[in-house]
Amino acid sequence: MNLTDLKRKTAADLAVICQDMGLEGTARQKKQEIIFNILNARAQCDAIYGEGVLEILQ
């Protein structure tokens, strides 16, 4: 599960993910806040990996 996949999901899909993860109080939150809560919960129990290009300017 990565950020791009979460952004593509509907609010209903995100609510199901929250329910599966045991997160409560997300029914009245904005989509971005729900995504943050999902990623925050994942960070607490797993590692979060990022990928991309790092440009070093000198």
Swiss-Prot record:
Gene3D superfamilies attached to this UniProt entry: 1.10.720.10
SMART domains for this protein: Rho_N
Pfam families registered for this protein in UniProt: Rho_N
Domain of life (superkingdom): Bacteria
InterPro entries named among the record's database cross-references: Rho-like_N (IPR011112), Rho_N_sf (IPR036269)
Keyword terms of this UniProt record: ATP-binding, Helicase, Hydrolase, Nucleotide-binding, RNA-binding, Transcription, Transcription regulation, Transcription termination
Coiled-coil residue spans: none
Enzyme Commission designation: 3.6.4.-
Top EC group: hydrolase
GO molecular function: ATP binding; helicase activity; hydrolase activity; RNA binding
Cell wall biogenesis/degradation is among the record's keywords: no
One GO term (biological process): DNA-templated transcription termination
Described purpose of this protein according to its UniProt entry: Facilitates transcription termination by a mechanism that involves Rho binding to the nascent RNA, activation of Rho's RNA-dependent ATPase activity, and release of the mRNA from the DNA template.
Similarity annotation: Belongs to the Rho family.
Oligomeric form and interacting partners: Homohexamer. The homohexamer assembles into an open ring structure.
Protein name, as recorded: Transcription termination factor Rho
Native source organism of the sequence: Acidithiobacillus ferridurans
Upper lineage: Bacteria, Pseudomonadati, Pseudomonadota, Acidithiobacillia, Acidithiobacillales
